Amino acid sequence: MYRRILLAATAAALLAGLAPARAQAPAPVELAGVKYPHTVQVAGSNLQLNGAGIRYKFIIKVYTAGLYLANKATTPEAVLAAPGNKRMHVVMLREIDGNELGKLFTRGMQDNAPKDEFSKFIPGMLQMADVFSTRRKLSAGESFSVDFVPGTGTQVLVNGKATGEVIREPEFFNALMRIWLGPSPADRLLKDALLGQSANSLSRNQ
């Protein structure tokens, strides 16, 4: 009896050892100590990390940024045309004045928006500038996200909390994304990283 039990236990152990290990979730992408999970949920939809990188000003690390989409996209055009929910998540690596950040967004949108479309983004730009101008500063480690949900609009979250009104203009999110992905991006290597083309920016991002 004991021999049968022992043989059965041994066989079970061998079979368990041969069974494929459970698939483990991939480790988050880590940049300057900031971790970006490979998947997040936005308004009930699972999104995957399209790419992440660091925004530099000269040699100073300013913030990390990660772009989440329903499906991978490797060109600015594909990102802007992608259906479904989207998220841009930014974590500060140094302190920045809230009013200055709002002005930088406005300037970046102005530099990259089609000239004949820029005027219709002004109300949304003012809304977003207000979100940051009401904060004295964003410190290192603080974060903000910009979520887009079709049919609803663009919502800014600061440190994970929805801030300000939803920006209803459907094209506003794309106008905002052009700050990082447009013809005059905030940082060209960050643009490549957000598009998943990080090979040319890995050494700089470490």
Please give the residue ranges for each predicted region.
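N-terminal export leaders
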Residues: 3-11
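Sec/Tat signal peptide C-region and signal peptidase I cleavage site
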Residues: 19-23
